[in-house]
Amino acid sequence: MRFVIVTGLSGAGKTQAIRSLEDLGYFCIDNLPPALIPKFAQVCYESESKINKIALVIDIRGGEFFDNLFESLKYLKEAGYKYEILFLDADNEVLIKRFKESRRKHPLAPNGRILNGIQMERKKLKTLYNMANNVIDTSKLATRELREKINSIYQEEGQIESKLIVTVVSFGFKYGIPVDSDLVFDVRFLPNPFYIPELKRFSGIEKPVKDYVMSFDQTKEFVNKIEQLLKFLIPNYLKEGKRQLIVSIGCTGGRHRSVTIANEIYERLKNDGETVNIDHRDIEEDINKGGKKL
């Protein structure tokens, strides 16, 4: 069992830290009242659940409940429950800038100067800072760099970092672009099987339409270019912390060309070892006469 208490100054990056730990497979709870830590630890250590990595964010947002933290930590030690503390810190000037940019009030100085709140918080957290197993100063760290530091400390040996989950969506422009799209490609420049009587009734999944759409040189070149682009983008998105990518392929009605192209891209990514899903959003819409969709 690895039991991590994440704490530190407001604005120092605890939210990003807990997200990074979650990506590493930690069961995470934000702002748990310190008085509940002993009972929670007991349940985790003594249960037969498969949860073996826990991360709790504990900070001064708990108000007067925060004062129970040291008593709870003492209980953990006496009970033999191992824990470690990760403390997030940053320079006063950086914290002030972050608060001003986010337009948030400091929890210890809601009606006063941000600096006063930071100074009060430092004093309140001094003992916890000295107890910390790991201290990360985020003053000069970008989000990606903080995640890399978290990974270097808490990623288990041999653990593979989370992969990017790619979802390829085919759609029809007449029903609207999927609102969660990251990348949108328009394949209406390709010859349309809809206007060929013997192909109209088939979808892009079926062989007659697929063979027709893929028979053109521009189709093959387009798919090759999309595959090359995604091979370049996926590792770079991962470096920046992105975990999901929605690639939307659109034609007029979402039944023929976009379906064939989406399937082709899906198969290529799968063969490349990517984690990939496929969704033909509008494949039945011309039949069902649906309206605009999300």
Swiss-Prot record:
One Pfam family per UniProt: PapZ_C
Transmembrane segments: none
Chain residues that bind ATP: 8-15
Keyword GTP-binding: yes
Protein keywords: ATP-binding, GTP-binding, Nucleotide-binding
PANTHER family: RNASE ADAPTER PROTEIN RAPZ
Homology family: Belongs to the RapZ-like family.
Name assigned to this protein: Nucleotide-binding protein CA_C0511
Species, as recorded: Clostridium acetobutylicum (strain ATCC 824 / DSM 792 / JCM 1419 / IAM 19013 / LMG 5710 / NBRC 13948 / NRRL B-527 / VKM B-1787 / 2291 / W)
